[in-house]
Design a protein with these regions (language model features):
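Solvent-exposed soluble domains appended to multi-pass membrane proteins
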Residues: 1-208
Length: 208
């Protein structure tokens, strides 16, 4: 990731081993998400101008235990196909609960800033629980929800977006139209030859 993010244009990269809170972990030894708040704010305060901060959380990762490991779970689960499945879902749901608390903490802190902020949150995959298409409401195993929070009063919109369209969509909504790829997504996303032309643009940038 250190090399990848540098090649993507990021000025700095802070990995887990450089965080003083790396020992604040859940029972699966994943660092708890709330530790990210400090580092996100530090990154935003590191410059006087606007910042583009990309943060990766890990608390909700598996494998999920098939026996009880939480002393006082906020959420209890029953009704799964087995007791082991109950414990797995119970563990996962309680991690989600803690992650929700982190999001509240983060948005509370961001709302105090005297600058425009847009926060985009999404999961890059469903939990590793052996899910099938019959287990999910939309019948798609490779789609996840995204949420956009802001302190600018942007109008709420519901759009079905590919991951590679998200950044261009957000930038479009805040009036930023810089970069050939962003401008292409913003202007051509709903046109007939969008995917073919996008492939040609990518080829030209990489090899042209």
């Amino acid at each position: 990731r250190k090399n990848v993010f540098a090649n993507l244009g990021f000025d700095s990269f802070t990995s887990e081993e450089y965080m003083s809170e790396q020992d604040d972990t859940n029972p699966n030894d994943w660092v708890r998400d709330h530790n990210l708040t400090k580092y996100i704010l530090q990154a935003m305060e590191s410059t006087e101008g606007p910042d583009y901060v990309y943060s990766i959380s890990v608390q909700g990762h598996g494998d999920y235990p098939e026996e009880p490991v939480l002393e006082n779970p906020k959420i209890t689960v029953s009704g799964a196909s087995s007791q082991a499945e109950n414990y797995k879902w119970e563990y996962y749901c309680n991690q989600i609960y803690e992650m929700d608390q982190f999001i509240k903490e983060l948005t509370d802190e961001l709302s105090k800033l005297d600058e425009d902020v847009v926060l985009v949150m999404y999961g890059d995959h469903l939990p590793t629980m052996g899910l099938t298409v019959t287990d999910v409401k939309n019948k798609y195993l490779f789609q996840t929800e995204y949420v956009i929070w802001d302190n600018m009063g942007l109008e709420k919109q519901d759009k079905n977006l590919a991951a590679y369209q998200m950044a261009a969509e957000v930038m479009d909504r805040v009036g930023i139209h810089e970069g050939n790829v962003f401008r292409f997504h913003q202007a051509r996303r709903n046109t007939k030859n969008y995917q073919v032309d996008l492939e040609m643009l990518q080829y030209d940038i990489l090899y042209g």
